[in-house]
From Swiss-Prot:
This is Optic atrophy 3 protein homolog. It is found in: Mitochondrion. One of its GO terms (cellular component) is mitochondrion. The keyword Mitochondrion applies.
Amino acid sequence: MVVGAFPIAKLLYLGVRQLSKPVANRIKAGARRSEFFKNYICLPPAQAYHWIEMRTKMRIMGFRGSTIKPLNEDAAAELGAELLGEAIIFVIGGGCMVLEYSRQAANSRRKEEELAQSITSLQTQLGELALTTETLDAQIREVNRLLLSLPAAPSSK
């Protein structure tokens, strides 16, 4: 019974993705507690996201030129923390995809190299067989020439 290779890399990637959610939640909680993190990491992307979202909604509804009020600090911090958490999960997922792609590319490259090596080996064997065939053909011609040059043996009855 042949047992296939255990896909340890895929299991590892799945584990990393599952661990990324609690890590993202802890980072979000830390972002809510830290003033520096809140003011410089969470608030600017949250306000930008809010501005873009509201501007898009206003344009879809047909309102032009209306001013958009910024979010209050607590709502912006919460939205920024959520955006940060989603970005972390997205980056980890993207990293897993890149690693899987590179692993698959390495496997494909290895298989192509093995195939090229096999083809080269077969070509070498074919060349050797052609040389052997030519040698045997020359020997057969030599034997035929010698047979034809022998005097005919008298038949005895």
